[in-house]
């Protein structure tokens, strides 16, 4: 380990004290100490290996940079021992540079590796924080101004997943939206909410609650005569560019818009769990469509929402909450305009559903020839390929052991049999076999 190199500490004046302390480190627990020559050999070797850093003074930054490069090297088998000595000496010098006093080079190596791991974790956290900050639409610039960025696709997909798994008005979606939307513009919040998967009736109710919040704001906050003050259009981001909506003077408007959305989600969620909620009114088994429609309309009329929302719920829920038979009958009768058809038209289309005539009609359609299972093709045998039976019922390939004919089994044979179960008449006889020795000549 002890290697002497010409020159001295004058080549590295910034490391004079560091080398002095490094000479107190033991190479092994019961071995000799590092020498000044060992330290100079290490430094000069590293300068030779990494010439692009040769002119830089040996600071903590340079030590860590060189350590990262040395750590990623893979030495040849013949140079492995010298490489380990180089790495251990570098670790000892790094510890002395940081003010530590390791007893042996093994302690120095362990200390540097542990310190390096902590620094890497901090860098990963910093990168993660920068990545999270980069997905927010409003970015604060160094000069103090603000710029706008589109909502990150990863964040949008996470919100979509939560909405699909837990529901658009669930507490999980509300928490996720409140966390992400703190730096969104009002336009971003409303556009993302509109693109989320969910029940159309729920979205109409949410929009109705937002309209109620806007109307309440107009009543309680009339515009002052001298101008100024927030308007509903500013809060909802109407008529604004994204760049203008991202500025600091619109922070209050964005916060109010987010609070309105959260209030709307909570209100619709409470409606969904309240007894008499029209979205929970579904047609029961064997219930006439007229009775179901009467219950549904009564529940919708009792809702504290505006008349346009009531009309929308009547058109939507009168189809989506109906039974499968009624939905099929409406599709068959009303066609593509089933969603826009009035409740009276749907009642007219479903008046015969459940009657004996309707059941006979369904049975006749099911038994209509030429419409078997699958894609409308008649049922065919996989054995012979002929229609009308299955492979387990196929007679092709079966041979009767009584008469020898194909197409039926012995127990189904109509041929004559004797009293003992044998076929009457002279049966076929094969050639008689007589045992004999083989001819030798």
Curated annotation (Swiss-Prot):
Segments crossing the lipid bilayer: none
A Pfam family recorded for this sequence: Gag_p24_C
Zinc finger (CCHC-type): 379-396, 398-415
Ranges where the record places region Disordered: 419-441
Keyword Iron-sulfur attached: no
GO biological process: viral budding via host ESCRT complex
Zinc-finger as UniProt keyword: yes
Cellular component annotations (GO), alphabetically ordered: viral capsid
GO terms of molecular function: nucleic acid binding; zinc ion binding
Motif PTAP/PSAP motif: where in chain: 435-438
SMART domains hit by this protein: ZnF_C2HC (SM00343)
Swiss-Prot/TrEMBL keywords: Capsid protein, Host-virus interaction, Metal-binding, Repeat, Viral budding, Viral budding via the host ESCRT complexes, Viral release from host cell, Virion, Zinc, Zinc-finger
Cross-referenced SUPFAM superfamilies: Retrovirus capsid dimerization domain-like, Retrovirus capsid protein, N-terminal core domain, Retrovirus zinc finger-like domains
PANTHER family named among the record's database cross-references: ENDOGENOUS RETROVIRUS GROUP K MEMBER 24 GAG POLYPROTEIN-RELATED, PTHR40389:SF4
Record remark: domains: Late-budding domains (L domains) are short sequence motifs essential for viral particle budding. They recruit proteins of the host ESCRT machinery (Endosomal Sorting Complex Required for Transport) or ESCRT-associated proteins. Nucleocapsid protein p14 contains one L domain: a PTAP/PSAP motif, which interacts with the UEV domain of TSG101.
Protein name in UniProt: Gag polyprotein
Record gene name: gag
